[in-house]
C-alpha cells in the first residue's frame, strides 16, 4: 500500500474534528503524528481558558489512536504575528478576524515547516471542513521548499495551481478561514473531513470511543458579536479582556439621524458595526452603524434593519489570491462577477470585482449587505472554489446616506422651482 510509507503530521486541538481527522488518516495506513500547538500563554493574564486541558485532551486522542504526540509552542509567534496585529486593528477602529490571520501565519506556515523540517513529515493535515483539487496521493508528490525561501519563485517552474474548494458540508465549510493561506501550504495539506458532514464526523468519533472530545464545546468562546473562536479569551467578558491591553478611549454614542448625543462609551474598539449598543435609560434597541476614530464618536441607529446599516460598495487592501495571481478574467477585463462573504456561514452574495493597480479591489454588491465591517476579510468564490480574500479597508456610502443625499437634492430642486417667477 502506497500510504504505508507516507508520514503525515496532523494538527490536534483536543476537539472532535481534529481527532477524527487523525483517526481517518490512521485508518488509511499513513504514519500519523499528532501535533498540539500552544499559541497562548495563560500565565500572561488572569484567564479562565485552560490550554493545559486542551493539550491533555489532544494527548488522550493520540494515545487512543496509538500515534506519537508532539507539543510545540508558538506563543511568541502568535503574539508577534497575530495578537499584536489584532490590537493594532482595534486601535484603528476596525474589527479584525484573528482566525484567518492565525491560519495564515501559524498553522499553515510555522506548523507546516516544523512538520516538514523537524518531524520529517511528507504532508500536514487539519480538521478543517474544506477540500482541494488534489487527490491525497498527489499531495505527497509536491515539492517542499525549506526556509528561507527565495525572494522570487522561479517563473520558469511549471506548476498547476491547486484550488481550495468548499467542503461537502456547506454549513460547516471553513474555506472562509483558509482564504489567506499560501499556494505552497495548500499543496502539502490534506483535509480528511472535506467530504464529510459534521454529524457523520461525530458518529465516527462515537463509534471509535472518542467520547471525551464529543463532550467538548465547539469552541472555547466566541466574541459577543460574531463567531471568531478566539479560545484564549475563555469565559471572560470580552470588554474586560480587551481593556487589559488597550487604554480606554471614552467617547459618545451619537444618533445617525439627528446627531444627538445618546450616551457615552469606554472606547470605539469595544464595538463593531451591527452590534447592539446598550444605552442606559432608552427604550428600544439601538445598533452601531459607524465609527469616527478621530472624534471617538460611535454612531447608532434605532433599529436592527436601519438603512444606515446597509451598503453595497467596499474596497479591500491588496487581495491574497490562492492561485498567487488574480483570475485571468479579472486581469483581462479589470472586472469580474463572483460571490463574496465577510462572515463565516453568511449566505454568499453576488458581486462585481473591479481590479485596482495596487492589487486591491472595489467590490460592488448586487444588493446592499448589512453591517459591512472594516477589518473583516472579504472572501471571494467562483462556484465551489474559494479564490482568496482581502481585508476590508473602506466602505461606500450607506443606503441612509444615499437617501439623505437624494432628499437634499430633491429639496434643492423644489426650492429652485419655487424661486421661478410664474409666467405672465
From Swiss-Prot:
It is found in: Mitochondrion. Transmembrane segments: none annotated. Residues 403-424 are annotated as: Disordered. GO terms for biological process: tRNA wobble position uridine thiolation. Pfam families: tRNA_Me_trans, tRNA_Me_trans_C, tRNA_Me_trans_M. It is an enzyme of class 2 (transferase). It catalyses: 5-taurinomethyluridine(34) in tRNA + S-sulfanyl-L-cysteinyl-[protein] + AH2 + ATP = 5-taurinomethyl-2-thiouridine(34) in tRNA + L-cysteinyl-[protein] + A + AMP + diphosphate + H(+). GO terms for cellular component: mitochondrion. GO terms for molecular function: ATP binding; tRNA binding; tRNA-5-taurinomethyluridine 2-sulfurtransferase. Belongs to the MnmA/TRMU family. NCBIfam families: PRK00143.1 (NF001138). During the reaction, ATP is used to activate the C2 atom of U34 by adenylation. After this, the persulfide sulfur on the catalytic cysteine is transferred to the C2 atom of the wobble base (U34) of mitochondrial tRNA(Lys), tRNA(Glu) and tRNA(Gln). The reaction probably involves hydrogen sulfide that is generated from the persulfide intermediate and that acts as a nucleophile towards the activated C2 atom on U34. Subsequently, a transient disulfide bond is formed between the two active site cysteine residues. This is Mitochondrial tRNA-specific 2-thiouridylase 1. The gene is TRMU.
Amino acid at each position: 500500500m502506497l500510504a504505508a510509507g507516507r508520514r503525515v503530521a496532523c494538527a490536534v486541538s483536543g476537539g472532535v474534528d481534529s481527532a477524527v481527522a487523525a483517526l481517518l488518516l490512521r485508518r488509511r495506513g499513513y504514519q500519523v503524528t499528532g501535533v498540539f500547538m500552544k499559541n497562548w500563554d495563560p500565565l500572561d493574564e488572569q484567564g479562565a481558558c485552560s490550554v493545559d486541558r486542551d493539550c491533555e485532551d489532544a494527548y488522550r486522542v493520540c494515545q487512543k489512536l496509538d500515534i506519537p504526540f508532539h507539543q510545540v509552542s508558538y506563543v511568541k509567534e502568535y503574539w508577534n504575528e497575530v495578537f499584536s496585529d489584532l490590537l493594532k486593528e482595534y486601535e484603528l477602529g476596525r474589527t479584525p478576524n484573528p482566525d484567518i490571520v492565525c491560519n495564515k501565519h501559524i498553522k499553515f506556515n510555522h506548523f507546516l515547516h516544523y512538520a516538514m523540517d523537524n518531524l520529517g513529515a511528507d504532508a500536514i493535515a487539519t480538521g478543517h471542513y474544506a477540500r482541494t483539487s488534489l487527490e491525497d496521493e498527489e499531495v505527497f508528490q509536491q515539492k517542499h521548499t525549506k526556509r528561507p525561501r527565495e525572494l522570487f519563485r522561479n517563473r520558469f517552474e511549471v506548476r498547476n495551481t491547486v484550488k481550495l474548494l468548499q467542503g461537502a458540508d456547506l454549513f460547516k465549510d471553513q474555506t472562509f478561514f483558509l482564504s489567506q493561506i499560501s499556494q505552497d501550504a495548500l499543496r502539502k495539506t490534506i483535509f480528511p473531513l472535506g467530504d464529510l458532514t459534521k454529524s457523520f464526523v461525530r458518529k465516527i468519533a462515537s463509534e471509535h470511543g472518542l467520547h471525551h472530545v464529543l463532550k467538548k464545546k465547539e469552541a472555547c468562546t466566541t466574541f459577543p458579536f460574531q463567531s471568531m473562536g478566539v479560545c484564549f479569551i475563555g469565559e471572560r467578558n470580552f470588554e474586560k479582556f480587551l481593556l487589559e491591553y488597550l487604554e480606554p478611549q471614552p467617547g459618545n454614542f451619537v444618533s445617525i439621524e439627528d446627531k444627538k448625543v445618546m450616551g457615552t462609551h469606554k472606547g470605539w474598539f469595544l464595538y463593531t458595526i451591527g452590534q447592539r449598543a446598550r444605552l442606559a435609560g432608552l427604550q428600544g434597541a439601538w445598533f452601531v452603524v459607524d465609527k469616527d476614530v478621530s472624534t471617538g464618536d460611535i454612531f447608532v441607529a434605532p433599529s436592527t434593519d436601519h438603512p444606515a446599516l446597509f451598503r453595497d460598495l467596499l474596497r479591500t487592501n491588496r487581495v491574497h489570491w490562492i492561485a498567487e495571481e488574480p483570475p485571468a478574467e479579472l486581469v483581462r477585463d479589470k472586472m469580474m462577477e463572483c460571490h463574496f462573504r465577510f462572515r463565516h456561514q453568511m449566505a454568499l452574495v453576488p458581486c462585481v470585482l473591479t481590479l485596482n493597480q495596487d492589487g486591491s479591489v472595489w467590490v460592488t454588491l448586487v444588493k446592499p449587505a448589512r453591517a459591512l465591517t472594516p477589518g473583516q476579510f472579504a472572501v471571494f468564490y467562483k462556484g465551489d472554489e474559494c479564490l482568496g480574500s482581502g481585508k476590508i479597508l473602506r466602505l461606500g456610502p450607506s443606503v441612509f446616506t444615499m437617501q439623505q443625499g437624494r432628499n437634499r437634492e430633491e429639496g434643492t430642486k423644489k426650492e429652485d422651482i419655487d424661486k421661478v417667477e410664474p409666467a405672465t
